[in-house]
Structure formats: structure tokens, C-alpha cells
């Protein structure tokens, strides 16, 4: 059995977890930085300072809760990209320091791969499988062929989906982060009321675009003073629009997999926006694959997914040098 200490500091969550190869989570510590809420978005400098302030304490807490000593660990893993460079440096340097002192292997984890692989901690998912990764910073379709081996089928050409949710929420006078609020208000709204553009729909490929939808909401919001019901209707219409676009793109992704003679049984929806139950249920209803998603606490950024990815990589002897430099941009299909 292998056991890994994992660190996640790529954005505004400071997180530490201890995970083993028996699929046990021995500790899961996470601190979300509430300072960003009043700023309406993530401020990199604030995020970096918070990581520096809290990371050591979270590591200490995780070790105490797991009843382990550093000598009991088999490796140290950290998210080393993509993400905000300040946070990546802090988390990666801490992991390297622990690895050096304890003489344990260091594993640099790609944040996107961690989102893609965490379902294998929870379910029996075999390679290859289709991935829709939707988060605050990324939106892309992938075929996961193996650990470290991915085919990117398409991605957003402008805003990420999480960014679109947050900007629409801001337009409607809602607080940050906007995703959970939009989903909640949409339950009381009429999703057919406002006609929003379905960008890229019916086109070939799997690329996406959300800037036009964001602009359409802004233009409609300028036309009249919105009541509470108007806001609910707009939230519902926005979600309907997004679900139509994703459904169209998923069908194209399945078609591409077939054309490549890659047999897909599982479709994984992951990333922070995958916490949106409306979108997941809509896709499950219309896609003839085994549709899986992590629970909400493992959709948003966390160290459990980093630890599990570290386990997957350690089992294949994929370890990294202490000279490894954090990568603010690090595409999955260019993993090595």
C-alpha cells in the first residue's frame, strides 16, 4: 500500500490531503479564502499571502488527523500547474522541501489531470473514458487514454464556463462565486423566457464559446429594471442555454471517439462547474453512456484529487526531479 501527502494551492483554495492506494482518504483539509468574495473575484496577491499563512498549519492538521508520521509516507505530491504562479510556487516549494528532508519522491501533479482522474478514486472507471472538464479557469473535452496520456477534442475559444457563470451573476447583481446562486435561483425561474444565443451549436468539432451569451445577458439586463422573478427567469434561461450547448458538443465528442476507433463506456463530468446538478442531470438524461461525476466537494479544487493522481503516477513510477519548475500554463496533451 502506498500513501501520499498532497498539496493544492493553484488558485484560492489552500488544501492538504493524505490518500492511500487502498482508496482511503486519511485526511482532507481545505481552507477557502473568503476575502475574494468582497472583491468579486480572485486576487492573486491575496491568494498567495493566504497560502503562505495557512499551508503549514493545514499540513500539521492533516498529519495529526491521519495518525501518521512523515516516515510513513511514500511520496509528496503538489499541484504544479496550471494556475496562479504565486500559489503554484508556494505549494510546489513546500512539497519539495518535505520530499527533500524526508528523502521521499516528489510528484508534480497537473491540476487538470487531477480533476480528470479523481473519479477513479470513487468508481471503477477504466481507460479510455471521455472527460468534460468545466471549471473557473478551463473548459475542454478530453479522451483520457491512460495516466499522462490525453487527447484534447475541443476547448473554449474565449471564456471558461465558470467565468461565464460568475460574470452573468455579476451582471444580475449576485455575489461571487456566481455558480451556486444561479443554480438556486434558476429553480424558481422560466428557462424558456429569454432567448439566448447557442454559440457553436450544430457545428462540427467540440470547441465552445460563451462570450456571446454573457454579452446577450448584459444587453437584456440594460433594457429594463429586473425584478426578482426576472432574475430567476434569466438564471434559468442561462442554464438552459448552457445545457443545450454542452449536449451538442458531447454528442460531437462521442462521434469523434467513434471515428478514432476508441471505445468509450464512461463519460466523466468534472471541475468546479460540475457541482451544478441541473447541467449534470440534463446530460445524464440524453447521453447513452455511463455518466459519472465526483461529489461537489471533489468537483471544486481540493487536495484529495491531487493525492489520488499522485498515487496513480507513483504506481507507474512517474516521479519528478526537485528541479521541476511550476507551470502556470500546462496543457494535458503536452504532459511530458
UniProtKB/Swiss-Prot annotation:
Enzymatic class: transferase
Keywords linked to the UniProt accession: Acyltransferase, Cytoplasm, Iron, Metal-binding, Transferase, tRNA processing
Reactions catalysed according to its record: L-threonylcarbamoyladenylate + adenosine(37) in tRNA = N(6)-L-threonylcarbamoyladenosine(37) in tRNA + AMP + H(+)
Matches recorded under NCBIfam families: gcp_kae1 (TIGR00329), T6A_TsaD_YgjD (TIGR03723)
InterPro entries referenced in this protein's UniProt entry, alphabetically: ATPase_NBD, Gcp-like_dom, KAE1/TsaD, TsaD
Annotated protein name in UniProt: tRNA N6-adenosine threonylcarbamoyltransferase
Gene Ontology MF: a single term: iron ion binding
EC id: 2.3.1.234
Function comment: Required for the formation of a threonylcarbamoyl group on adenosine at position 37 (t(6)A37) in tRNAs that read codons beginning with adenine. Is involved in the transfer of the threonylcarbamoyl moiety of threonylcarbamoyl-AMP (TC-AMP) to the N6 group of A37, together with TsaE and TsaB. TsaD likely plays a direct catalytic role in this reaction.
Localization (cell): Cytoplasm
Binding positions for Fe cation per the UniProt entry: 111, 115, 301
Cofactor binding mode and count: Binds 1 Fe(2+) ion per subunit.
PANTHER family given in the database record: TRNA N6-ADENOSINE THREONYLCARBAMOYLTRANSFERASE (PTHR11735), TRNA N6-ADENOSINE THREONYLCARBAMOYLTRANSFERASE, MITOCHONDRIAL (PTHR11735:SF6)
Family to which the UniProt record says this protein belongs: Belongs to the KAE1 / TsaD family.
Membrane-spanning parts: none
Disulfide cross-links: none
HAMAP family: TsaD
One Gene Ontology CC term in the entry: cytoplasm
Necessary cofactors: Fe(2+)
A GO BP annotation: tRNA threonylcarbamoyladenosine modification
Record-listed substrate binding positions: 133-137, 166, 179, 276
Amino acid at each position: 500500500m502506498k500513501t501520499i501527502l498532497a498539496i493544492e494551492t493553484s488558485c484560492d483554495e489552500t488544501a492538504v490531503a493524505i490518500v492511500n492506494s487502498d482508496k482511503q482518504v486519511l485526511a482532507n483539509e481545505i481552507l477557502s479564502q473568503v476575502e475574494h468574495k468582497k472583491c468579486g473575484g480572485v486576487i492573486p496577491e491575496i491568494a498567495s499571502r493566504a497560502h503562505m499563512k495557512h499551508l503549514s498549519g493545514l499540513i500539521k492538521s492533516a498529519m495529526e488527523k491521519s495518525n501518521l508520521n512523515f516516515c510513513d509516507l511514500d511520496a509528496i505530491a503538489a499541484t504544479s500547474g496550471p494556475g496562479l504562479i504565486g500559489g503554484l510556487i508556494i505549494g510546489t516549494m513546500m512539497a519539495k522541501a518535505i520530499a527533500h528532508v524526508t528523502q521521499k519522491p516528489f510528484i508534480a501533479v497537473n491540476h487538470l489531470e487531477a480533476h480528470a482522474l479523481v473519479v477513479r478514486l470513487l468508481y471503477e472507471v477504466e481507460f479510455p473514458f471521455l472527460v468534460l472538464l468545466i471549471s473557473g479557469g478551463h473548459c475542454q473535452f478530453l479522451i483520457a487514454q491512460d495516466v499522462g496520456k490525453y487527447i484534447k477534442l475541443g476547448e473554449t475559444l474565449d471564456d471558461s464556463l465558470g467565468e461565464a457563470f460568475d460574470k452573468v451573476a455579476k451582471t444580475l447583481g449576485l455575489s461571487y462565486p456566481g455558480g451556486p446562486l444561479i443554480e438556486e435561483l434558476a429553480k424558481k425561474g422560466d428557462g424558456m423566457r429569454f432567448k439566448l444565443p447557442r454559440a457553436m451549436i450544430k457545428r462540427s468539432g467540440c470547441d465552445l464559446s460563451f462570450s456571446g451569451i454573457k454579452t446577450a445577458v448584459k444587453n437584456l439586463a440594460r433594457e429594463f429594471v429586473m425584478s426578482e422573478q426576472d432574475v430567476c427567469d434569466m438564471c434559468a434561461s442561462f442554464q438552459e442555454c448552457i445545457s443545450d450547448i454542452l449536449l451538442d458538443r458531447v454528442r460531437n465528442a462521442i462521434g469523434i471517439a467513434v471515428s478514432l476507433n476508441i471505445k468509450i463506456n464512461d463519460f466523466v463530468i468534472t471541475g468546479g462547474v460540475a457541482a451544478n446538478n441541473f447541467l449534470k442531470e440534463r446530460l445524464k438524461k440524453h447521453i447513452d453512456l455511463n455518466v459519472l461525476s465526483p461529489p461537489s466537494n471533489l468537483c471544486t479544487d481540493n487536495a484529495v484529487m491531487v493525492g489520488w493522481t499522485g498515487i496513480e503516477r507513483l504506481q507507474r513510477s512517474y516521479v519528478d526531479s526537485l528541479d521541476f519548475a511550476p507551470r502556470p500554463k500546462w496543457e494535458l496533451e503536452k504532459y511530458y
